[in-house]
């Protein structure tokens, strides 16, 4: 879709570290938002979200993202750099086709998938922050990633390993008795996450990568929720 669509309004919101470009709708009842509501309903009725994603899913919240980790001692927090703007349209269309036809075949064809991507995006790459369709499409995009990364973590045979994702925030926690072992595990997990994300055209934001050992730091903050070390 072209940025000059009359139903689109572009706003620039200043945050602490940068200015975000928010693309939203001219009005609640404009043609584009009405169209997006229909697309959203169609997708929500047919898409089964990853069990690991806690953001943008009805009935899940920041608490559901943090609480599964509360009994672990070691935490690795990763951030996907500029997640929405770097979503690949070709891959997204393929994932829509796969996910919508997963439970029941012939729910959607490839031409319709390409139409959804074109209708819900601006330019040749990414999803706009501000479109009501972007959250569910972003979860479709990373559902496969969630499952592959968790499978890798399970193969590492970590004690009580937990993985969750809230939009672009990745949280991994586990138990281990050795700090030296923790550093090795941390490096393996970060390297594997980077490699997997690169297949989706995405990168880790190295500045926001964090690792916590509750024996040292005593607490960790996950999507605004504090987890503290129990005595």
Go through the PLM ranges and name each one.
Residues 55, 88-90, 225, 229:
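Regulatory and interdomain segments flanking nucleotide-handling catalytic cores
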Residues 11-36, 118-139:
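Short, conserved non-catalytic motifs in the polymerase core
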Residues 68-167, 171-188, 192-197, 207-219:
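Conserved polymerase palm-domain catalytic core
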Residues 199, 221-231:
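Active-site and adjacent loop segments of nucleotide-processing enzymes
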Residues 202:
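Active-site or ligand-binding cleft "flap/edge" segments
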Residues 39, 134, 224:
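A residue-level signal for conserved active-site and pocket-lining positions in enzyme catalytic cores
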Residues 1-10:
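Amphipathic alpha-helical blocks
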Residues 29-77:
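Active-site-proximal segment of RNA-dependent polymerases
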